[in-house]
Amino acid sequence: MKRELLQKIMELRQQNVTQFFVACDYGVGLYAAEQINDLRKTDPDLMLFCKLPHEGQATKWAPYLRERYFKMLEDCTHIDCISLRAQPDAQLLAYQRIIDQSDLILTVFDSGASAAGPAEEKALAYALVSRKPVLNLDPYTLAVSRIDKRADK
């Protein structure tokens, strides 16, 4: 799945996408951010904007994940923190800010199931209502499909 995600990021870059926004969760968000930071080493026009739900997001993560997380933040272009402390809606607010600032949304979830959690489900609904194009990489089939309403037209 990581290889397919990197391939999709590189395809978007070839289509002149230079700015990537990531919510920096310990799963796909961290993988994507690390991949973008690696690409930035040879592509000075590429930018990574990290939208953190709150400052202590990684406090309870395993030490190896915290290490990767802080390295990723150190290497990114810009960090924006939604809240100083954890709030029930901070993750959703981070996703919404990303959606508002994006022309295209790239998601990773099992297209045969609902999104990973309530914040992710609400964020996907928000992207669709915002009429943003949404590309999804299915982590099991590795298929990329367009899931927004405009895909039907």
Labelled PLM ranges:
Residues M1-A151:
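Acidic/glycine-enriched connector segments
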